[in-house]
């Protein structure tokens, strides 16, 4: 820190994305545009195992167990999405995550557990989806950045400063020790699908 010759202050009560944009703007002497655009584009993705119809990507995996949402709630949501004409696709990054996705998909006729995927393929699936529902994970932030209607589910952390944020439709549900219910998620999903 002794080599820095400039200091900038940003309001610590602002969302992390806004804080970082303001900090970069101050350091580089510009004012960030009000509209938030992450500038991400994703090439299309198709695979034989992926259904052709409308998709809802369910991002059930996260870095900590206390951020997980109960499988029983995922099953309720996935079944309801099937009734709404969406095919739930459940990816997972490692073996444990793919096993969880497979258990949920096996309990929901018509849901699909994705095979192991790279980030480009996963981003392609997210970009094709009509809706993304995910726990506190970077993939929920990616869905929001891609302007896919996104529901981010929080069970162990407060989303006020680090929840999903974008220019498309998004909603942060739950919070520290406040897991959202399947009913809350489905109510918000209705809003997202009508937006």
Regions found by a protein language model. Give the residues of each.
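Catalytic machinery of carbohydrate-active enzymes
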Residues: 1-195
């Amino acid at each position: 820190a002794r080599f820095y010759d400039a200091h900038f202050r940003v309001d610590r009560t602002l969302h992390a994305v806004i804080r970082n944009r303001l900090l970069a703007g101050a350091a580089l002497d510009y004012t960030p545009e009000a509209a938030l655009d992450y500038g991400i584009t994703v090439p299309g993705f198709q695979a034989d195992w992926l259904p052709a119809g409308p998709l809802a990507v369910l991002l059930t995996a996260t870095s900590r167990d206390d951020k997980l949402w109960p499988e029983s709630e995922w099953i309720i949501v996935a079944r309801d999405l099937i009734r709404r004409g969406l095919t739930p696709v459940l990816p997972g990054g490692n073996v444990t995550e793919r096993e969880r996705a497979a258990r949920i998909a096996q309990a929901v006729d018509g849901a699909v557990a994705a095979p192991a995927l790279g980030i480009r393929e996963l981003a392609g699936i997210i970009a094709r989806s009509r809706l993304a529902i995910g726990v506190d994970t970077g993939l929920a932030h990616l869905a929001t950045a891609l302007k896919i209607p996104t529901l981010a589910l929080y069970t162990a952390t407060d989303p006020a400063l680090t929840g999903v944020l974008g220019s498309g439709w998004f909603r942060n549900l739950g919070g520290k020790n406040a897991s959202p219910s399947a009913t809350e998620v489905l109510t918000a999903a209705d809003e997202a699908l009508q937006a």
